[in-house]
């Protein structure tokens, strides 16, 4: 029953912490939302659903592979107000400046918040890698902040518990 509902696009599997992003953002019908690191699209789909099909969720990610993941979920769920495109979040998109009611930046991180599910993380993240991640996060946030229109919202999110990833 669960598998059938998932395949038909009636349900979307999402971690509680990911789900909270859309709840905090609370987009309204007609809003324009940009999700800068969107793959595989769960937050974008949730935002579009909360908007009841009105407005647009612009789900972006760095590669065609990641955008394909988003598009598969858009098609599976028949989401009419979510669109996906390749856009490197570290490169400023002048066409999006001051346009978005909500910008979601669920940036790459060390992953310490999901270490229980992915124990190999503790062997993969070095102090140097951590420093590189923080620089990447700050670059993405700097770009994303420019897309928020006056009185809009920028939602910063990571799946980590590392202080460096959250400051």
Question: Language-model features: where?
Answer:
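S-adenosylmethionine
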Residues: 2-167
């Amino acid at each position: 029953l669960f598998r059938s509902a998932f395949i038909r696009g009636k349900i979307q599997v999402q971690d509680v912490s990911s789900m909270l992003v859309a709840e905090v953002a609370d987009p309204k019908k007609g809003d324009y939302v940009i999700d800068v690191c969107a793959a595989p699209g769960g937050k974008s789909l949730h935002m579009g659903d909360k908007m009841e099909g009105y407005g647009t969720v612009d789900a972006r990610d760095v590669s065609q592979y990641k955008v394909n993941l988003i598009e598969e979920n858009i098609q599976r769920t028949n989401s009419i107000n979510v669109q996906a495109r390749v856009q490197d979040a570290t490169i400023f998109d002048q066409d999006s400046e001051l346009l978005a009611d909500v910008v979601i930046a669920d940036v790459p991180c060390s992953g310490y918040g999901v270490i229980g599910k992915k124990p190999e993380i503790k062997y993969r993240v070095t102090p140097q890698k951590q420093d590189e991640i923080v620089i990447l996060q700050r670059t993405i946030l700097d770009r994303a902040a420019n897309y928020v229109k006056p009185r809009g919202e920028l939602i910063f999110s990571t799946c980590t518990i590392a202080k460096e990833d959250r400051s």
